[in-house]
């Protein structure tokens, strides 16, 4: 009996102190830009999943990408970065946004992002959602800097514990204008904004993507 009591006691203790991890994923039209104060890796961007601790608060920055319009009027809509703060869960979670069919819907989403967090079984998880305001020629390169400032501001979806982490991992912002800019190995110098953006994103891409882009550019001369 004593042995049984000891076993039951250990089992109860383990159950009460155990930490379970769940997976977080997104709907197909969302991509992770940052997770818990750190830039989302390229591999994570492809997998669109990461593991969370159910006892902790988590913060992600996501962006909605959607092809809108039809036929020859199709275009790519990219939303402003959106901050989503939520509590981890032992069950897998899905962060999702509705489909955007036209630019008007995209503008409405930018003004008031409709993003939900639910468990795989469909239960809604409380989440704080806010737009990460950005400025400059290459705003996506400033996500971590802007997020650090946001977390330090005490705004609705801010998490103060990520302020230091975000600041330490923040990227150097690419300057606007027609000047040369070094961002790692990235250098841009163009006659207009469009040319600078093309140079910037071309140098950000991997070799395979660069090759595909060059082939595409040749076919559209």
Swiss-Prot record:
Keywords per UniProt: Signal
Domain of life: Bacteria
InterPro entries: UPF0319
Residues of the signal peptide: 1-21
Residue ranges of the TM segments: none
Family: Belongs to the UPF0319 family.
Entry protein name: UPF0319 protein CGSHiGG_02140
């Amino acid at each position: 009996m004593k042995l049984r009591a000891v076993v039951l006691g250990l089992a109860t203790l383990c159950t009460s102190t155990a930490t379970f991890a769940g997976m977080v994923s997104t709907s197909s039209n969302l991509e992770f830009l940052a997770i818990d104060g750190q830039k989302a890796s390229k591999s994570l961007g492809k997998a669109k999943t990461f593991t969370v601790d159910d006892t902790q608060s988590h913060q992600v920055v996501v962006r909605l990408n959607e092809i809108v319009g039809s036929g020859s009027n199709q275009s790519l809509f990219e939303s402003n970065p959106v901050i989503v703060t939520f509590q981890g869960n032992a069950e897998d979670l899905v962060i999702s946004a509705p489909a955007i069919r036209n630019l008007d819907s995209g503008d409405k989403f930018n003004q008031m992002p409709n993003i939900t967090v639910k468990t795989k079984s469909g239960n809604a998880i409380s989440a704080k959602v806010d737009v990460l305001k950005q400025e400059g020629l290459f705003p996506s390169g400033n996500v971590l800097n802007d997020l650090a400032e946001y977390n330090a501001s005490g705004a609705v979806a801010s998490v103060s514990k990520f302020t230091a982490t975000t600041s330490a991992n923040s990227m150097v912002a690419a300057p606007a204008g027609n000047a040369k800019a070094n961002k790692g190995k990235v250098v841009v110098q163009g006659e207009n904004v469009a040319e600078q953006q093309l140079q910037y994103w071309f140098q950000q891409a991997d070799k395979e993507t660069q090759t595909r882009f060059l082939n595409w550019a040749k076919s559209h001369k």
